């Protein structure tokens, strides 16, 4: 009887193969995704996936962890070196899990937090309906300057003094420009607040020294996922310097384990470690090319007739390009993103700061990220070609199937994962 279920295995493996073939021939511009190197993929598919470990290396609650411990200790060494921190905890299994640990470790129900609203690019885990709310925090949101596409510093300073929060959170999901950590962290600390920086989207840019340096600008803690501009497997990390009293750090560590996780997905942990080594070796060049590509794509899209956000600020300082398509169709991003998918161009619709929340399914914006296409070797010239593909679909109204054929041929030339020990740098950066 069990033999009859083999077809489900075959179907699943078939769908996986179909997905991999499809993805290799699309232009993936999802800002929260990336591609791992063969070495990292090997680590994630290793026998570490079968192992269980709880607690700190050399202090496990399970036996048989001697090799796992060595890998995790290497990881702590590499992450602290990469980010210039005192501590790095690789155990969180996602960025949201890392945020949970900080909220549960350093705050109490009823404490106040100031975060970025989701309409302004804040992450759902920061909100009353996310991890912050589940902790029972009273959530306030940063005043936002739509023209600057950033936190309003003067109004934020006033809000901090009025609210006297226990924690303030910088960072988010719509993140083209650095946040004013340097300006606002001292004010937060005046009222006794912890300063947390959610670097999920920009962790690789921080590692590559191409974005702001939160720990040097006043943040106590960086939380992040490890699979966006930091091109590792899906997972999380908490990076921090010494802050407060020893007992406060102990509370944070206790919140991670046994608070919000037990075993920490050791195969993914191993992949994070190899990715950290790759970023120490290649991260500065990778991050620099990401920012160059984002700027090039933004400029090219503007030249093709799109309304790209942030023109007076150089469009972007990160991997993200934000486009307002509300003038192209009543459904705006809700129309554009599926149409582009038909053409093999993958990105996501996104609320813009002036959108009401009820427009979540038909928001004004598109969020574009260039980190994955950068990692497969694309540079500024390729960004211009991508902009032309997008114009053909959304402005020229060409048949997406026709554009898809051209996208397939274009993407076929970019199949290696660079900025890695497997393939080194792209050839054009070796010259």
From Swiss-Prot:
Pfam family, one: SHMT
Gene: glyA
Modified sites of kind N6-(pyridoxal phosphate)lysine: 228
GO cellular component: cytoplasm
Listed HAMAP family: SHMT
Class in the EC hierarchy, top level: transferase
Keyword field: Amino-acid biosynthesis, Cytoplasm, One-carbon metabolism, Pyridoxal phosphate, Transferase
Phylogenetic classification of the source organism: Archaea, Methanobacteriati, Methanobacteriota, Thermococci, Thermococcales
Organism: Thermococcus kodakarensis (strain ATCC BAA-918 / JCM 12380 / KOD1) (Pyrococcus kodakaraensis (strain KOD1))
Protein known as: Serine hydroxymethyltransferase
Family recorded in the similarity comment: Belongs to the SHMT family.
Binding site for (6S)-5,6,7,8-tetrahydrofolate: 122-124, 245
UniProt cofactor(s): pyridoxal 5'-phosphate
Annotated PROSITE patterns: SHMT
InterPro entries reported for this sequence: PyrdxlP-dep_Trfase (IPR015424), PyrdxlP-dep_Trfase_major (IPR015421), PyrdxlP-dep_Trfase_small (IPR015422), Ser_HO-MeTrfase (IPR001085), Ser_HO-MeTrfase-like (IPR049943), Ser_HO-MeTrfase_PLP_BS (IPR019798), SHMT-like_dom (IPR039429)
GO terms assigned for molecular function: glycine hydroxymethyltransferase activity; pyridoxal phosphate binding
Subunit and interaction comment: Homodimer.
One GO BP annotation of this record: tetrahydrofolate metabolic process
UniProt key word Oxidoreductase: no
Record function comment: Catalyzes the reversible interconversion of serine and glycine with a modified folate serving as the one-carbon carrier. Also exhibits a pteridine-independent aldolase activity toward beta-hydroxyamino acids, producing glycine and aldehydes, via a retro-aldol mechanism.
Pathway(s) of this molecule: Amino-acid biosynthesis; glycine biosynthesis; glycine from L-serine: step 1/1
Keyword Nucleotidyltransferase in annotation: no
